[in-house]
């Protein structure tokens, strides 16, 4: 079974058609796979879609449909939600010190990266991320990362 972790930048492509959406949609059709997100992505996804409403990219109705589709993916276990723990927060602080002094590692990304690293110790095959700066940081941490906007994921 292939296990994927979707950063929010990749996850949003499941619910809003844009560059990289076809690659993300293809993951969801794989038979023997598991897709994991952090509980933080629930908030980040809502924020990203709300921004699309404010900027006129989608309607409020489309926002509600996308959130409903996301909830359906979670309820049907199409997506597994992992909870950030205290150890992840401690690890995120260390990652900010390691990377934040030289690169633009943001707070929420450091939390996502801490979870990715924890999961990679036992069950993670690949990270999907559509933020090239963050992809570079993830890669420096030794994880396999693909950008759905640039890479074929199959």
Which residues make up each language-model segment?
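Helix-adjacent hinge/juxtasegments
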Residues: 51-86
């Amino acid at each position: 079974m292939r296990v994927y972790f979707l950063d929010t930048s990749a996850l949003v492509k499941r619910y809003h058609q844009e560059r990289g959406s076809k690659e993300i949609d293809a993951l969801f059709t794989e038979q023997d796979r598991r897709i994991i997100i952090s509980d933080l992505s629930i908030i980040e996804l809502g924020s990203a879609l709300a921004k699309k409403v404010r900027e006129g990219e989608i309607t409020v109705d489309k926002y509600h449909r996308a959130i409903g589709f996301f909830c359906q993916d979670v309820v049907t276990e199409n997506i597994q939600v992992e909870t950030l723990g205290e150890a992840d927060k401690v690890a995120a602080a260390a990652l900010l010190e390691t990377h934040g002094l030289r690169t633009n590692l943001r707070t929420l990304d450091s939390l996502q990266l801490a979870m990715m690293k924890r999961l990679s110790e036992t069950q993670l095959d690949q990270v999907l991320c559509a933020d090239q700066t963050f992809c570079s940081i993830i890669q420096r941490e030794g994880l396999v990362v693909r950008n759905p906007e640039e890479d074929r994921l199959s």
